[in-house]
Swiss-Prot record:
UniProt KW Hydrolase keyword: yes
Family: Belongs to the 'GDSL' lipolytic enzyme family.
Enzyme class, broadest EC rank: hydrolase
InterPro entries from the UniProt entry: SEST-like, SGNH_hydro, SGNH_hydro_sf
Influence of pH: Optimum pH is 8.5. Shows high stability over a broad range of pH 4-9.5 (80-100% of enzyme activity). Becomes unstable at pH over 10, where the activity drops to 34% at pH 10.5 and to 8% at pH 11.
Active site (catalytic residues): 44 (nucleophile), 250
Activity regulation summary: Strongly inhibited by Ag(+). The cations Ca(2+), Mg(2+), Co(2+) and Cu(2+) do not significantly reduce the lipolytic activity of SCO1725. Is also inhibited by DTT in vitro, but not by EDTA or by the reagent masking SH-groups, p-hydroxymercuribenzoate (pHMB). Is resistant to PMSF inhibition, except in the presence of Ca(2+). Is also strongly inhibited by 3,4-dichloroisocoumarin (DCI), another inhibitor of serine hydrolases. Addition of tetrahydrofuran and 1,4-dioxane significantly increases (2- and 4- fold, respectively) hydrolytic activity of lipase towards p-nitrophenyl caprylate.
Temperature effects on activity: Optimum temperature is 20-30 degrees Celsius (DOI=10.1016/j.enzmictec.2008.01.009). The His-tagged protein shows a higher optimum temperature of 55 degrees Celsius, and a thermal denaturation midpoint (Tm) of 66.63 degrees Celsius. Is stable when incubated for 30 minutes at temperatures in the range of 30-70 degrees Celsius at pH 7 (DOI=10.1016/j.enzmictec.2008.01.009).
One Pfam family linked to the record: Lipase_GDSL_2
Protein name (Swiss-Prot/TrEMBL): Lipase 1
Domain of life: Bacteria
Length: 268
């Protein structure tokens, strides 16, 4: 902000200058505050399930200090940071319980949502424990939901975000492909792995389309996770963990910092 030094010997000039400064101050006071708060919405891929270092006050939402929203906020120091993403969240949960911090002062919103609506957890359980035909059938059911029902649910969430945070830049974060193909992978056939990856692509396509329709940016993490899928030499995803089943198929801390954070940095 410029500083003005008033030099004058005539009272009329002093008064005129004072009036000018008063007008300028009034104009400045009328300007809205900058929108530079950050709100992180979504499901377990945003809250950081699988990354560890969970914030105790987040309870079952399992928000991690190693999750990409937390890492981004630590690096960029937004004026405010509200972390409402929650493990297990569906679109309805975002609408009912996560949008409170959004306002005209929100400058950035990130969100990953849709996987739970499409039945991701049940699909993966079916593919791991049941036959190839059962796996493919369950994937087909999930894809049909993604085509027929999910777009409307995403539109409801995205419209609500725009209404509550009209000045925000919104980044819709996608999901990785889960398996490296062409390698030996215990427990899952190549056919199952291929179908699961295609289902992830299918979901990402719909997410990107609906994001674009609302003027949002889509953050595609499939490229950053290439070479770090399950059955690769250095996976950034947890495989099935029977001792902590909730972390299965979720990004590790390295997946959050190396797979998700660069995408958010580039899109924000």
């Amino acid at each position: 902000m410029r500083r003005f030094r008033l030099v004058g010997f005539l009272s009329s000039l002093v008064l005129a200058a004072g009036a000018a400064l008063t007008g300028a101050a009034t104009a400045q006071a009328a300007q809205p505050a900058a929108a530079d708060g950050y709100v992180a919405l979504g499901d377990s891929y945003s809250s950081g399930v699988g990354a560890g270092s969970y914030i105790s006050s987040s309870g079952d939402c399992k928000r991690s200090t190693k999750a990409h929203p937390y890492l981004w906020a630590a690096a960029h120091s937004p004026s405010t940071f509200d972390f409402t993403a929650c493990s297990g969240a569906r679109t309805g949960d975002v609408l009912s319980g996560q949008l409170g911090p959004l306002s005209s002062g929100t400058g950035l919103v990130s969100i990953s949502i849709g996987g739970n609506d499409a039945g991701f957890a049940d699909t993966m359980t079916t593919c791991v424990l049941q036959s190839e035909s059962s796996c493919l059938s369950r994937i087909a059911t999930a894809e049909a939901y993604v085509d027929s029902t999910l777009p409307g649910k995403l539109d409801g969430v995205y419209s609500a975000i725009s209404d509550k945070a009209p000045n925000a830049h919104v980044v819709v974060i996608g999901y990785p492909r889960f398996y490296k193909l062409g390698t030996t992978c215990i427990g899952l056939s190549e056919t199952k792995r291929t179908a699961i990856n295609k289902a992830s692509d299918h979901l990402n396509t719909v997410l990107a389309q609906r994001a674009a329709a609302h003027g949002f940016t889509f953050g595609d993490v499939r490229t950053t996770f290439t070479g770090h899928e399950l059955c690769s030499g250095s996976p950034w995803l947890h495989s099935v963990n029977w001792l902590n089943i909730g972390e299965s198929y979720h990004p590790t801390a390295a997946g959050q910092s190396g797979g998700y954070l660069p995408v958010l940095n580039g899109a924000a």
